[in-house]
Amino acid sequence: MGDVMYYPINLKIDDMKVVIVGGGKIAYRKCTNFLAFSKKVVIISKDFIDEFENIKDEVEIIENDYDEKYIKDAFVVVAATNNKNVNHEIGIYCRQHGKLVNVVDDSSLSNFAVPSFVKRGDLLLSISTGGKSPSLSAKIRQDLEKIYDEDYEEYVNLLGEARQKIIRDVEDVNERKIKLNS
């Protein structure tokens, strides 16, 4: 058996608690990404880079060292400290307690990876190289951002409205299928 592949899945986490342990650049990037999908993001660290000031009203900030009490009720945990031992401890705890965990400096402890993505309203395009080339993922994301610009948010909304109208108004299953696929 070769490399373990990640299963592509979209999770609805808007009401789920996401805890990020760490206050540096990686933690900040992870935090801003999760804020696009969850309203319950908690950051734990004694020290924070200045950028966290920009999002302090959108997240819960706990200025303290890591303690497992902070992640007991979390659905998703990101271990992004500058201490490999602490990240390892978080990863082990989460794996033993059935939590989704991403350990930024040890993928063997992670049970999920956050792909690069383009989000245009409900259109979500994910890009992953399985961790082999984050720079290629970033390049592909940049290319897709040019192709799928901000107008796609409205386009997807219009398609969704048309789909609902067809489902509501067209009783014949075969005719509905033809209209939905055209």
Language-model regions: role of each:
Residues V41, I61, L100-V101:
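Hydrophobic beta-strand scaffold residues
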Residues F75-T81, P115-G131:
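Short basic, glycine-rich beta-strand/loop surfaces that mediate nucleic-acid
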Residues G131-S182:
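An accessory alpha-helical subdomain
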